[in-house]
Amino acid sequence: MAKLTKRMRNIREKVEVTKQYEIAEAVALLKELATAKFVESVDVAVNLGIDARKSDQNVRGATVLPHGTGRSVRVAVFAQGANAEAAKEAGAELVGMDDLAAKVKAGEMDFDVVIASPDAMRVVGQLGQILGPRGLMPNPKVGTVTPNVAEAVKNAKAGQVRYRNDKNGIIHTTIGKVVSTKHKLKENLEALLVALKKAKPSAAKGVYIKKVSLSTTMGAGVAIDQASLSATV
């Protein structure tokens, strides 16, 4: 049997796997256990009461967290004319059409989010095999194919997170950095859960949000007592 590292022993000693922690206690514990040499992210896993095998029960969307994610985001926009100018003014790092597509095909992909105006999809459509596997393909369901590219750029810069359930019906995303305050992480989590509830498929029956867990990049998962969150969630 592999020998446990000091870090893993510490996590095992302090995290009760069967306990549901109040949000403040959970965040305090995550901060205590975040000992990596880099600033760890605080990630969330939300188990949904859906049948992920059925297309009408899949959950996908995006929401802007009130306190952002704590990371800087580089945005590429496929647009032309007035939309291109609006994207630049909103802070997009890369803006173009065929010229930008050529850079992507050449492997120049120094960006985290791709946004496109509807008329640019004829160009973006050629990049599906490159952008798709990386989760970068623009999609109207998450607001990255839109006539209002400036607003989409601002949302991306403001800390918008995109979510999509996996084959087990679990949403995985981030709600900030471990250096964020308890208050900010709590409000970001609540905002995400509100968005997920609004996105609940009509075909989903029974308990919708079954379990919420937080973890840091290098840490163990901590289950959250949903009763400790805002009543609006």
Curated annotation (Swiss-Prot):
Cite a single GO BP annotation: regulation of translation
Q: Which GO terms describe its cellular component?
A: cytosolic large ribosomal subunit
Q: Which cysteines are joined by disulfide bonds?
A: none
Q: Which Gene3D superfamilies match?
A: 3.30.190.20, 3.40.50.790
Q: Name one GO molecular function term.
A: tRNA binding
The chain's coiled-coil residues are: none
Cite the entry's keywords alphabetically: Repressor, Ribonucleoprotein, Ribosomal protein, RNA-binding, rRNA-binding, Translation regulation, tRNA-binding
- Function according to Swiss-Prot or TrEMBL: Binds directly to 23S rRNA. The L1 stalk is quite mobile in the ribosome, and is involved in E site tRNA release. Protein L1 is also a translational repressor protein, it controls the translation of the L11 operon by binding to its mRNA.
Describe the family membership recorded for this protein in Swiss-Prot or TrEMBL.
Belongs to the universal ribosomal protein uL1 family.
State whether it acts alone or in a complex, and with which partners, per the record: Part of the 50S ribosomal subunit.
Q: What is this protein called?
A: Large ribosomal subunit protein uL1
Per the UniProt entry, what species is this protein from, by scientific name?
A: Proteus vulgaris
Underlying gene:
rplA
